[in-house]
Amino acid sequence: MINEIKKDAQERMDKSVEALKNNLSKVRTGRAHPSLLSGISVEYYGAATPLNQVANVVAEDARTLAITVFDKELTQKVEKAIMMSDLGLNPMSAGTIIRVPLPPLTEERRKDLVKIVRGEAEGGRVAVRNIRRDANNDLKALLKDKEISEDEDRKAQEEIQKLTDVAVKKIDEVLAAKEKELMEV
């Protein structure tokens, strides 16, 4: 029973860290990266379709993304979807290839992005702490029902705290790496 609670907490904490990494990958840095456009959907046969299903996105160089659209008729829709996104990008098309130059980030915009990233990381920490709380509540319920002893409860809570510390440390490492990436000129 205790092992199930610990395993569940571990899995949920790992998912929280992965979700944070995924969210942070969408934050624009000064460098071109295909995942930058991963959140963009294009209207395709009446359905919103992720960009990576209707086109191939590659980093042409450090400041340019190249998008090869599979269906010529979608080129304008892809361009429009990129312009309508809140990324502040201006695509230029040449046939079926769309080039998206990334303007350099201003110092002020970098600082704003760092604040956003820190907020995301704090959200990740809160999620991990909530998972710890849920696990500890499950342990208290077992203790109350006399399914485990107080010693087992205390030991399990200490182990869950260790899992929490590891997850928070991972979040801090991800945050530090993203901040460093954002502040590079």
Swiss-Prot record:
One of its GO terms (biological process) is cytoplasmic translational termination. CDD domains: RRF. Keywords: Cytoplasm, Protein biosynthesis. GO terms for cellular component: cytosol. One of its GO terms (molecular function) is ribosomal large subunit binding. It is found in: Cytoplasm. InterPro entries: Ribosome_recyc_fac, Ribosome_recyc_fac_dom, RRF_sf. Pfam families: RRF. Its main location: cytoplasm. Belongs to the RRF family. NCBIfam families: frr (TIGR00496). HAMAP family: RRF. Responsible for the release of ribosomes from messenger RNA at the termination of protein biosynthesis. May increase the efficiency of translation by recycling ribosomes from one round of translation to another. This is Ribosome-recycling factor. The lineage of its organism: Bacteria, Pseudomonadati, Pseudomonadota, Gammaproteobacteria, Vibrionales.
